[in-house]
């Protein structure tokens, strides 16, 4: 299990990202538009840099919903490979079977 502080930090990042998502998108749209003047684009870059670092989506880490394990995470199930295997062996995931060839 991951430490509680790391789990809380991740929750905080998710909350911050939701809060600033719209503003971040608007600023990135201004920055990427070549028809806007350089001074306006530069101001947009400065505003984007002034936003909290943790409000960026790339700062988030996908974690297992049961153990908060960051590695070997499968997006489709929201679990790490270890917990996915355990759940599959117990038959808790519909349509998932152990392969055999």
Swiss-Prot record:
Part of the 30S ribosomal subunit. Contacts proteins S3 and S10. Binds 16S rRNA, required for the assembly of 30S particles and may also be responsible for determining the conformation of the 16S rRNA at the A site. Belongs to the universal ribosomal protein uS14 family. GO terms for cellular component: cytoplasm; small ribosomal subunit. Pfam families: Ribosomal_S14 (PF00253). One of its GO terms (biological process) is translation. Signal peptide: none annotated. This is Small ribosomal subunit protein uS14. PROSITE patterns: RIBOSOMAL_S14 (PS00527). It comes from Wigglesworthia glossinidia brevipalpis. One of its GO terms (molecular function) is rRNA binding. Keywords: Ribonucleoprotein, Ribosomal protein, RNA-binding, rRNA-binding.
């Amino acid at each position: 299990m991951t430490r509680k502080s790391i789990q809380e930090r991740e929750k905080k990042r998710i909350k911050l990202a939701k809060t600033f998502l719209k503003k971040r998108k608007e600023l990135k749209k201004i920055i990427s538009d070549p028809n806007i003047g350089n001074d306006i684009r530069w101001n947009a870059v400065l505003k984007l840099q002034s936003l909290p670092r943790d409000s960026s989506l790339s700062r988030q880490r996908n974690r297992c919903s049961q153990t908060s394990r960051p590695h070997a995470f499968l997006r489709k199930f929201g679990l790490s490979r270890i917990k996915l295997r355990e759940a599959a062996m117990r038959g808790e995931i519909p349509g998932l079977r152990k392969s055999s060839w």
